[in-house]
Amino acid sequence: MLKKLVFTLFCSFLSFCCFSQKTENDWTIKKNESGIAVYTRTAANSSLKELKAVFYVKTSLSSIIALIDDRENYSQWVYKCGKSTILKKISETQEVHYQTTIVPWPLDNRDFVITTSLSQDETTKIITIKSSESPNFIPNVKGFVRIQLLEASWVLTPLKDGIVEIEYRLLVNPSGAIPAWMANLVVTEGPLNTMINFKQWVMKPKYQAAKVSFIKEVD
């Protein structure tokens, strides 16, 4: 009985190790343009593709947060964003956000509702922003297919000389019938174009001058 228990525990540990190795190392680079590297991998226990974009910007943490928090202007720089608005401000660091995505005819446009939370490590000053779907927060909107699965995160890591490493991850099921070419846009072209625009927009005077009260900069 004891031998069987030990064997079972060992198998469980081995499975966990293999799973951890996959989730940390199984990325494939898809794009590397304008200083932005875009990777994908198959999500655990799913056929969906998870995306990771990594790039570097010389700017303050406040400027980045000011841009990310400026939801009303997402249509100006987020790829194919039609509308973006805050539905509920829970606190300085938590909110519920609604956004639409415009897709080519004859496909139906998509929309989603997400709850977003921000935290900052007191020692390293690393900022983590996590978003997950809240599809039932408001009723479905006519003309849009509501996305039921969306998980996203930003990790902002301050480095030397004012450089910030930005890592963005996205796992999304666009819902409904999606052709392969659109799926490719979702996981590669769309995020790449968004991050190219991000690097330009964060340098605008409006964001460069921003001082976000709850964000601590590196000394």
State the predicted function of each range:
Residues 6-7, 44:
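Sequence-pattern detector for short linear motifs
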Residues 1-5:
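Positively charged n-region of N-terminal signal peptides that target proteins for export
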Residues 8-15:
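Bacterial N-terminal signal peptides
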